[in-house]
C-alpha cells in the first residue's frame, strides 16, 4: 500500500498535470470505485476546475472550488495522464476528461481504491480520515504530543503505529524501518517505552518520512508516481523485506513474524524486549 511518502510523491507529480484544467465530463467504468452515487459524481464535477492537489496522510484531496474529491489509493491505485480517446485498459476504472482533450485516469489492479465527492471543508468527516492522528513529520507531530499519546495506549507499538490513530502516514514498510532504527521491539507495549526510546522513535519517524519523500517513495511491488516513475527509497531500506539476511548493525539474521496480521521483520539482538 502506498504510504505517506508515496502519496506525497503522487501529489507532487499530479499537481502540474491537472491544476488549472477544467472537466468536460467524467467516465466511470467500474461503479464501485466511487463511494456514493456515481451519477451524482459525474454530474457535479462537470465544468469544475482542479485548483489544488492536497494530501493528508495517505489520502489525496483534489480541490475543485466548493467541492473536493477524496482519493484513497489503497493497495494498487495509480493516476496517469492520457487523452480522452486513448484505449481503455481493463484496469482503468475512471477518467476525468478535460476540455483540452487530455484525461486523468485512475487505474487499480486490485480494485480496492475509492474516490468520494464531498463539499470542501467536510473532507475530515469522511470514513478513514475522521479518526486519523496528526501527520508524521508535521508541525503538529510534537514530541510532547507523541509522549502523551503513547502513555495512554497499552497495545504493542507496531500495532499502534499501523492503526494511524496517534500518528498518520506510516505503513508496514516504514514502521519496520523506524522501529529498527530506534532499536525497539515491535511487540513492546506503547506505554512501556522509555523516554529515550520515545525520543529516538519520534526522530526516526520524521527523518525516515522526509528522506523517503526525497527519494520519491519506495517501490517494492508496483508503486509508480503520476509520471510513471518508480521510487528509489527501496535502495535505502535496512530491514523491511530482508528476513533471513544479516542485520547491518550487528550481523544477526533478521526474523519475520506476524503482528496485527502484517508481516513484521526485525532483529532479535538489536530489538530486544
Curated annotation (Swiss-Prot):
DNA binds at residues 91, 110, 153. GO terms for biological process: base-excision repair. Binds 1 zinc ion per subunit. InterPro entries: DNA_glyclase/AP_lyase_DNA-bd (IPR015886), Formamido-pyr_DNA_Glyclase (IPR020629), FPG_cat (IPR012319), MutM-like_N-ter (IPR035937), Ribosomal_uS13-like_H2TH (IPR010979), Znf_DNA_glyclase/AP_lyase (IPR000214), Znf_FPG/IleRS (IPR010663). It catalyses: Hydrolysis of DNA containing ring-opened 7-methylguanine residues, releasing 2,6-diamino-4-hydroxy-5-(N-methyl)formamidopyrimidine; 2'-deoxyribonucleotide-(2'-deoxyribose 5'-phosphate)-2'-deoxyribonucleotide-DNA = a 3'-end 2'-deoxyribonucleotide-(2,3-dehydro-2,3-deoxyribose 5'-phosphate)-DNA + a 5'-end 5'-phospho-2'-deoxyribonucleoside-DNA + H(+). PROSITE patterns: FPG_CAT, ZF_FPG_2. Its cofactor is Zn(2+). The keyword Zinc-finger applies. Its EC number is 3.2.2.23, 4.2.99.18. Pfam families: Fapy_DNA_glyco (PF01149), H2TH (PF06831), zf-FPG_IleRS (PF06827). The active site is at residues 2-3, 58, 262. The keyword Transmembrane helix does not apply. Disulfide bonds: none annotated. Belongs to the FPG family. HAMAP family: Fapy_DNA_glycosyl. Monomer. Involved in base excision repair of DNA damaged by oxidation or by mutagenic agents. Acts as a DNA glycosylase that recognizes and removes damaged bases. Has a preference for oxidized purines, such as 7,8-dihydro-8-oxoguanine (8-oxoG). Has AP (apurinic/apyrimidinic) lyase activity and introduces nicks in the DNA strand. Cleaves the DNA backbone by beta-delta elimination to generate a single-strand break at the site of the removed base with both 3'- and 5'-phosphates. This is Formamidopyrimidine-DNA glycosylase. It comes from Lactobacillus delbrueckii subsp. bulgaricus (strain ATCC BAA-365 / Lb-18). The lineage of its organism: Bacteria, Bacillati, Bacillota, Bacilli, Lactobacillales. The gene is mutM.
Amino acid at each position: 500500500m502506498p504510504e505517506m511518502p508515496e502519496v506525497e510523491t503522487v501529489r507532487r507529480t499530479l499537481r502540474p498535470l491537472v491544476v488549472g484544467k477544467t472537466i468536460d465530463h467524467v467516465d466511470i467504468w467500474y461503479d464501485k470505485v466511487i463511494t456514493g452515487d456515481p451519477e451524482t459524481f459525474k454530474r457535479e464535477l462537470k465544468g469544475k476546475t482542479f485548483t489544488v492537489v492536497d494530501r493528508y496522510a495517505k489520502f489525496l484531496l483534489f480541490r475543485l472550488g466548493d467541492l473536493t474529491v477524496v482519493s484513497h489509493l489503497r493497495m494498487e491505485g495509480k493516476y496517469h495522464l492520457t487523452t480522452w480517446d486513448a484505449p481503455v485498459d481493463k484496469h482503468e476504472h475512471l477518467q476525468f476528461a478535460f476540455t483540452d482533450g487530455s484525461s486523468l485516469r485512475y487505474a487499480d489492479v486490485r480494485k480496492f481504491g475509492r474516490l468520494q465527492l464531498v463539499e470542501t471543508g467536510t473532507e475530515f468527516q469522511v470514513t478513514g480520515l475522521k479518526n486519523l492522528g496528526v501527520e508524521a513529520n508535521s508541525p503538529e507531530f510534537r514530541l510532547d504530543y507523541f509522549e502523551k499519546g503513547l502513555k495512554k495506549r497499552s497495545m504493542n507499538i507496531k500495532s499502534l503505529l499501523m492503526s494511524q490513530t496517534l500518528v498518520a502516514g506510516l505503513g508496514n514498510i516504514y514502521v519496520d524501518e523506524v522501529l529498527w532504527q530506534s532499536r525497539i521491539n515491535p511487540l513492546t507495549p506503547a506505554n512501556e517505552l522509555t523516554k529515550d526510546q520515545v525520543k529516538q522513535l519520534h526522530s526516526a519517524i520524521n527523518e525516515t518520512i522526509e528522506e523517503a519523500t526525497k527519494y520519491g517513495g519506495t517501490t517494492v511491488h508496483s508503486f509508480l508516481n503520476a509520471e510513471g516513475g518508480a521510487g528509489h527509497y527501496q535502495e535505502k531500506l535496512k530491514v523491511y523485506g530482508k528476513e533471513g539476511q544479516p542485520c547491518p548493525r550487528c550481523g544477526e539474521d533478521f526474523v519475520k513474524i506476524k503482528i496485527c496480521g502484517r508481516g513484521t521483520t526485525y532483529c532479535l539482538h538489536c530489538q530486544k524486549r
